[in-house]
């Protein structure tokens, strides 16, 4: 259900409502930080994701867990929004709502999301180099990097910006050489 159009159709109005609340209270960046933390938690804890999306578990239990997870440092508006998702039985779409909110935030701040796959973890200098390259390619004011590691690349990086892919990996270069030699 993660990428289905139905889940997007359900998540989008909630994300827009949250964006509207955050804009009217000048909390867009703060909500963005809290939502990124929540997404990290959901991505690193399949148990939590399953717990929240399980229709058999009572709403009170889900609310209690969310209250504990979010703590007092989370803005009350965002906590109340999460409780609303539980009440409306839409908490199973939390991940999609969060992703959609971040997409709206990037659009608002002229920020582009760049998914970077590298053979090893990028150091600060390499990250900055990738950010500069993405800014040049996209014309965006800011870049949000989503980095992952794939040792099969051997070296280099693959950068995905929207539907555009820049393959600067050794594996990609070897594949292109293989294709050109195969055509001879």
Curated annotation (Swiss-Prot):
Main location group: membrane
A GO term for molecular function: proton-transporting ATP synthase activity, rotational mechanism
GO cellular component term of the entry, any: plasma membrane-derived thylakoid membrane
InterPro entries listed in its UniProt record: ATP_synth_OSCP/delta_N_sf, ATPase_OSCP/d_CS, ATPase_OSCP/dsu
Membrane topology: Peripheral membrane protein
Cellular localisation: Cellular thylakoid membrane
The entry's keywords: ATP synthesis, CF(1), Hydrogen ion transport, Ion transport, Membrane, Thylakoid, Transport
Gene3D superfamilies: N-terminal domain of the delta subunit of the F1F0-ATP synthase
The organism's place on the tree of life at top rank: Bacteria
Entry keyword annotation includes Thylakoid: yes
Family: Belongs to the ATPase delta chain family.
Subunit field text: F-type ATPases have 2 components, F(1) - the catalytic core - and F(0) - the membrane proton channel. F(1) has five subunits: alpha(3), beta(3), gamma(1), delta(1), epsilon(1). CF(0) has four main subunits: a(1), b(1), b'(1) and c(10-14). The alpha and beta chains form an alternating ring which encloses part of the gamma chain. F(1) is attached to F(0) by a central stalk formed by the gamma and epsilon chains, while a peripheral stalk is formed by the delta, b and b' chains.
Function summary: F(1)F(0) ATP synthase produces ATP from ADP in the presence of a proton or sodium gradient. F-type ATPases consist of two structural domains, F(1) containing the extramembraneous catalytic core and F(0) containing the membrane proton channel, linked together by a central stalk and a peripheral stalk. During catalysis, ATP synthesis in the catalytic domain of F(1) is coupled via a rotary mechanism of the central stalk subunits to proton translocation.
PANTHER family noted in UniProt: ATP SYNTHASE DELTA CHAIN
Protein name as it appears in the record: ATP synthase subunit delta
Organism: Gloeothece citriformis (strain PCC 7424)
């Amino acid at each position: 259900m993660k990428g289905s159009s139905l889940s997007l159709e359900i998540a989008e109005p909630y994300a827009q409502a949250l964006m509207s609340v955050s804009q009217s209270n000048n909390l867009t960046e703060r909500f963005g930080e809290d939502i990124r933390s929540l997404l990290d938690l959901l991505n690193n804890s399949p148990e939590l994701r399953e717990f929240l999306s399980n229709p058999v578990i009572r709403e009170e239990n889900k609310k209690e867990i969310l209250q504990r997870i979010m703590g007092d440092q989370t803005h009350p508006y965002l906590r109340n929004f999460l409780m609303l998702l539980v009440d409306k039985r839409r908490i199973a779409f939390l991940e999609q709502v969060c992703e959609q909110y971040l997409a709206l935030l990037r659009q608002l701040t002229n920020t582009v999301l760049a998914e970077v796959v590298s053979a090893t973890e990028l150091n600060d200098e390499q990250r900055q180099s990738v950010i500069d390259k993405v800014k040049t390619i996209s014309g965006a004011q800011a870049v949000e990097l989503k980095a992952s590691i794939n040792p099969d690349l051997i070296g280099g990086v693959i950068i995905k910006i929207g539907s555009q892919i820049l393959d600067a990996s050794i594996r990609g270069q070897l594949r292109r050489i293989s294709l050109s030699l195969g055509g001879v």
